[in-house]
Design a protein with these regions (language model features):
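Bacterial N-terminal signal peptides
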Residues: 1-9
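Formylglycine-dependent sulfatase
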Residues: 11-399, 405-427
Length: 429
């Protein structure tokens, strides 16, 4: 802890570090080379892990897009942030993050940071819920849940709508690849603000459907089974842009002054628009829209060369709400809102033997819920997954598993471990 204390003490007197939060969309539990995907090229993420700390028991705040983002930006469980389902994807639609919630951007802005949202928003498509009303000085990207990466239209059930904005102005970049536009926008923002600390929320619309990897990546994976070939091409395309973004930080001479963190918002999709799959959840059961491990256990990394450990792995139980208090502690800035559920990860980052900062974690999502305490996990009203055994009537109500003994969540112990069930259920109150 002495090393971390020196870093934090120095930070309080020196210029505050820049922070870039990279948030990918529908990236599966092990969909990176550094997480064991041997059929996938991700040199950008692999290098980030080599220059930082990689987490193996990191949980998204939800198994669906908007609530996961709400948890990230507020440090609160989505149910306490007031958003447990997706926000609308058409202008003026219902749902979104309440403007009264204090966001990560507002916290950084109050500490003198320049703040930018670049990429996907999906936290409200009304003026009072869009990024510039939530603490971001600058915003570039789409407000809805996804777009075509070349036309920048939201294609769903109609009407199809164009969705690309710079601040409150609709812009048109027809035919230009959205991940490239994101890197260009981030580079311009960093260049403009390189003399002061900045915070960038870099929220990628990948590998969320539509699967639109570059030609070179489609060629690279053409012999893989469908739809893994399409999915991998898009993951490698996003990784290529992450690598480019980090090289731009290096080029500007800012790497040792910049904390870069990465997380997927939840597990991979098996929706029809996603070709019914393509992602890899490894040994875990489940996927997006489920609270099995494959829906919420996600890849996550933090890197700050010269300040945090390099090429190390942490196995403690952590959560997407933890980024806000962690960044605040590392940057020595005060939290505006202290009534949050996230806990600082700094002790875990520094010490592989430090305990998890959480006694337990909880999830609430459209009727489903889950509690994890230690190795025990209780799911309430679990949704069937395409990769697990069929759920019996009792399983559909309560499903208890010991993750240390059954990482695939295949055997329900709720009927025999009633004392554990009662203990975990009580934590929801």
């Amino acid at each position: 802890m002495a090393l971390l204390f020196l870093f934090l003490t120095a930070t309080s007197f020196a210029r505050k570090p820049n922070v870039i939060m990279i948030f990918t969309d529908d990236q599966g539990s092990i969909d990176a080379g550094c997480y064991g995907a041997d059929d996938l090229d991700t040199p950008g993420l692999d290098k980030l892990a080599q220059r930082g700390v990689r987490f193996t028991q990191f949980y998204a705040a939800s198994a669906v897009c908007s609530p996961s983002r709400a948890g990230l930006l507020t440090g609160r469980y989505p149910i306490r942030a007031g958003l447990i389902g997706n926000a609308g994807s058409q202008k003026g639609g219902k749902g979104g993050l309440d403007p009264d919630q204090i966001t990560m951007a507002e916290t950084f802005k109050a500490a003198g940071y320049a703040t930018a949202h670049i990429g996907k928003w999906h936290l409200g498509y009304n003026t009072n819920m869009m990024p510039r009303a939530q603490g971001f000085d600058h915003s570039f990207g789409h407000m809805g849940g996804c777009i075509d990466n070349f036309s920048h239209f939201f294609y769903w059930s109609g009407p199809n709508i164009h969705d690309l904005w710079r601040n409150e102005t609709e812009i048109f970049e027809d035919g230009k690849y959205f991940p490239d536009l994101m890197v260009e926008e981030a580079t311009a923002f960093m260049t403009l603000n390189k003399e002061k600390p900045f915070f960038i929320y870099f929220a990628m619309n990948a590998p969320h459907y539509p699967y639109q990897g570059d030609v070179k990546w489609r060629e690279r994976y053409k012999d893989l089974p469908y739809p893994r070939n399409l999915y991998n091409a898009f993951v490698s395309a996003l990784d290529q842009r992450i690598g480019k973004l980090i090289r731009e930080v290096d080029r500007l001479g800012l790497r040792n002054q910049t904390i870069i963190a990465f997380q997927s918002d939840h597990g991979h999709s098996v929706e029809s628009r996603a070709h019914h799959g393509g992602g890899n959840n490894g040994p875990y059961r489940g996927h997006k829209f489920t609270l099995w491990e494959g829906g919420i256990r996600v890849p996550a990394i933090i890197s700050w060369p010269g300040h945090l450990p390099r090429n190390e792995v942490r196995d403690q139980m952590l959560h997407g709400c933890d980024w806000l208090p962690t960044f605040a502690e590392l940057a020595s800035i005060p939290l505006i809102e202290n009534d949050i559920d996230g806990k600082s990860m700094t002790q875990v980052i520094e010490d592989p033997d430090a305990p998890s900062p959480h006694e337990y974690l909880r999830w609430d999502m459209s009727g489903q819920w889950a509690i994890r305490k230690g190795d025990w996990k209780l799911l309430g009203n679990p949704k069937a997954s395409i990769d697990g055994p069929a759920l019996e009537a009792a399983d559909k109500k309560l499903f208890l598993v010991n993750l240390a003994e059954d990482i695939a969540e295949s055997t329900n112990l709720a009927g025999t471990k009633t004392n554990i069930v009662a203990e975990l259920k009580a934590l929801r109150n």
